Amino acid sequence: ILTSIDIDPEHQRAAREAYAAAGIPSQRTRVISGDAGQVLGRLTDGAYDLVLVDADKEGYPVYVEQAIRLLRTGGVLVLDNMLWHDKVADPASRDGLTTLLRDLGKALREDDRLLPLLLPVGDGLLVAKKVWVPESGE
């Protein structure tokens, strides 16, 4: 099931229209109205093959932790705007959002649960595969 979360009714309408135009049956889609920070916590662990995060950048750290929980092993996390107008790669850029995204990218590179790749397309896509991590003692 293709699940979309958005707080804006216009975005929800546009999503439904795009799904219909793509020929995706409505019973294969779910549009959830609400704040992603609250909705994500109610979704099922390990039930998703792909999670795309394209939301308020301040919320990215929370959304990413929830997304990792939602992904099955082998699932893919995609984050939009990870180059943030080419400022993330510029050490002289130190505004709050740039620093947040730079730190998040570094944290994801160091996260043993993920195999990340930053693609320099558009405003930067970070694509990360969730890998199997044995629990301690295994």
Regions of interest found by a model, annotated:
Residues I1-E138:
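S-adenosylmethionine/decaboxylated-SAM
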